[in-house]
Amino acid sequence: MDHHQSGTRPARRIALIGTDFDGTVFAGGDTMVSAEHYRAFRRQLQHLRGAFGTHWAVVTGRHVSAMPLLLNELLMHGLSPDFMVMEDARIYRRRGSRFRPFWWWNFSIWLRRRRQLARHRERVRATMASIQAEHPTAVSMGGNRMIDLWYEFDADGAAVAVERRLLDQFAGESDFFVFRWGREVCLAPTAGTKGEAVRRLASELGAHRREVFTVGDGQNDISMLDPVAAGLIACVANAQDEVRIAVERAKGFIASGQHIAGVVEALHFYAQKKA
């Protein structure tokens, strides 16, 4: 039997598993991933939950409105997280069949982000007006959410062009970072990172950082792939160069497998490695 599928008791306690979604747990696009990798991950979760009461959090930059879609995609593989962290830092905990927000935590994230945006309000609005004029078919994804400048474009080229423009325009800014998911591009306030959310969850669970496992592939994952947030750090083989560098610097594990296969590999590495 494959070692990822074995029922042996894990050698190390892992209290919290924090995984990115796009590019990590799910490949997206036309990339084909074997269902066996998801079955292996489900078995790992079952073993860890049975042995240590381990909790699993999906930590994603996706809008809160995308939560039902993500949960359905996970459910198709028999997976159900204990927490959903949306827009990098907004925390929701599973209660029965529903996910309930961490009201005060989420409000504090909202307030900090609004203050950051307020300091650059005119500049951000001018940039949004320019983007809308140049790309009239772009769909604004911001609305009343925590991030104003968030667009979905109808072509990859347009998204890449706007991403590059924002990177140049806001280079060196400590209040913002630029991120792109396929055809979606956002200018995100730096307040409320994935790393902060993971630390908040660890505190909620009474878990020491040495009992926290995190894995990702993209730039906005770097804050949780940091020894300040987690002691068991990993990235999948398809991770961006900046992410691999961050994991190497943290003396973490770089998987040879891509997407969920890499998650299974990294989790097995740490679960069977004595503390």
What does each model-identified segment do?
Residues L71-E73, V162-L167, E242-A250:
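Short, aromatic/basic amphipathic alpha-helical patches
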Residues R39-E134:
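Active-site phosphate-binding/coordination module
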Residues I17-T24, E87-A89, G96, G143-M146, ...:
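Short loop/turn segments at strand-loop or loop-helix junctions that form parts
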